[in-house]
Regions:
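Hydrophobic or amphipathic alpha-helical targeting/insertion segments
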Residues: 2-5
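Residues forming the flavin
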Residues: 7-464
Length: 464
């Protein structure tokens, strides 16, 4: 009511543990309402591009889609072609946008829409937004935070805060030293899908003032693909849930339910890797039927991007491998041949019966959300029978770390004695996660926005 922030209900997006007591199969989470980006004026050029996997990208083309549209498009589910044609026609024929902004999409969705609406709300109140300004340290006086030190246009400046400083700087996922210190193994900054500049600077500054931390070994995990030439991991959330593939370790054996929520899958990876299971990295295996009809990460379905159009640098055992037979694929990708053949036989039987006797893939509403309802008897399982066969390497990555500064119910940062550090607040991934088990979509952004609101309320003393 008091801003341009607008969200809409996701009626069919289930909780990540929908079969647990209190779980729901939809109508809990929300996504930002799409918005016309030209409302930002020239500030549209300052808006960070969406992660390439939250848009349709091919060459210079960069067409956005919503969460609901993404389910259809990324899964190549019935109706995706009609939806794609509608969105693409509107996008490509937007000549005023092409002339002024190149290939940028006028229609902002997902995170871009959320940020754009926040920016517009600030502009409505004539609030200045400084870009290209990096906080380098906190300024404290007698134990109270009174401002920050920053680097702006290559000049060091001090910014005074008369009422308080709110840290909302993301996690420490791009700092390899902090990853080595806190996160489960294996762990590489290059596997993270997060902002390149999330190096924990605010966390380090608060630690210098004696701030307490918690849950530093947790993250918003997801398997990722390491696309050659890209500096971020490509989150694999949908691909391995679709029917017609399975994921194996170096021995060619499955080790976790591919269709379960992405955080739980990677938690399984870490736990089993620590026990000696060679499952990190792991390998998503699919055949020519899957390849023809479904995308896999940045690899579009063969009907849109045949093998001849795949960049040559992608064909590497650390990313994408191909074999005319499963035995040949095993040799190229470095997977145990006998184990892979045995797994194929098992999965093909499960696809026919509709019941995964090993890992219960397809049993829950979340599993089936990214399945294909046209595939029966199990929307998450289809046989792998027709060569050539493919392997996509998956690494244990994340979209951000989930541990950080300990805060109270007003978002005030606490020290190791449990006392408030006056003038210092935190929200988002630089603070300790409220929902570290990731019970459902929005478990990161929901608390981040809530505690940002609570921090502002405490700082201003407003009763709203």
């Amino acid at each position: 009511e008091n801003s341009q922030v607008k969200y809409r209900n996701l009626a069919h997006y289930p909780d990540y543990f929908p079969d647990n007591p209190g779980g729901k199969e939809g109508n809990r989470s929300m996504e930002p309402e799409p918005i016309n980006g030209t409302q930002l004026g020239n500030d549209l050029g300052k808006l960070r591009e969406q992660h390439p996997q939250t848009a349709f990208t091919m060459g210079p083309i960069n067409m956005n889609f919503t969460q609901v549209e993404g389910q259809l498009l990324l899964g190549a589910l019935p109706g995706w072609k009609t939806l794609f044609a509608k969105l693409f026609t509107k996008y490509i024929l937007d000549l005023p946008m092409r002339l002024k902004w190149g290939w940028k999409d006028r229609r902002l969705t997902m995170g871009n829409a959320g940020v754009a609406r926040l920016v517009l709300s600030l502009k409505d109140r004539n609030v200045d937004i400084w870009t290209e300004t990096a906080m380098t340290d906190l300024i404290d006086e007698n134990g109270s935070v009174i401002g920050i030190k920053a680097l702006r246009n290559n000049s060091e400046i001090n910014i005074k805060a008369s009422k308080g400083v709110i840290l909302a700087s993301g996690g420490f996922e791009k700092d390899q030293e902090l990853r080595d210190q806190y996160l489960p193994k294996p762990s590489k900054a290059e596997w993270s899908a997060a902002n390149t500049y999330n190096t924990g600077d605010a966390l380090k500054a608060a630690l210098r003032l004696g701030a307490d931390t918690h849950q530093m070994d947790t993250g918003w995990w997801s398997t990722v693909m390491k696309v050659p030439g890209q500096d971020k991991g490509w989150l694999s959330m949908v691909d391995k849930s679709m029917p017609g593939n399975f994921t194996v370790n170096k021995n060619g054996e499955r080790f976790s339910n591919e269709s379960q929520n992405y955080v739980s899958f990677v938690n399984d990876m870490f736990e089993k890797y620590a026990e000696g299971n060679p499952c990190a990295p792991c390998y998503m295996i699919f055949d020519s039927t899957f390849r023809k009809n479904r995308p896999c990460g940045p690899l579009l379905q063969a009907s849109m991007q045949p093998d001849s159009a795949v960049p040559k640098e992608w064909w590497t055992p650390s990313f994408l491998s191909k074999g005319e037979t499963l035995e040949e694929l095993a040799e190229v990708a470095g997977i145990d041949k006998d184990g892979l053949l045995a797994t194929q036989a098992k999965v093909n039987e499960y696809a026919k019966s509709g019941k995964d006797l090993d890992l219960q893939r397809g049993d829950t509403a979340y599993d089936r959300y990214y399945g294909d309802p046209s595939v029966t008897p199990n929307p998450c399982l289809a046989p792998l029978e027709k060569g050539p066969f493919y392997s996509m390497v998956l690494y244990p990555g994340e979209m951000g770390t989930a541990g950080g500064l300990v805060i109270d119910t007003h978002a005030r940062v606490l020290n190791k004695e449990g006392n408030v550090i006056p003038g210092l607040y935190a929200c988002g991934n630089c603070s300790t996660a409220l929902l570290p088990t990731y019970p459902g979509p929005g478990s990161t952004l929901g608390p981040a926005m809530t505690f940002g609101y609570l921090a502002a309320k405490d700082i201003t003393g407003a009763n709203f």
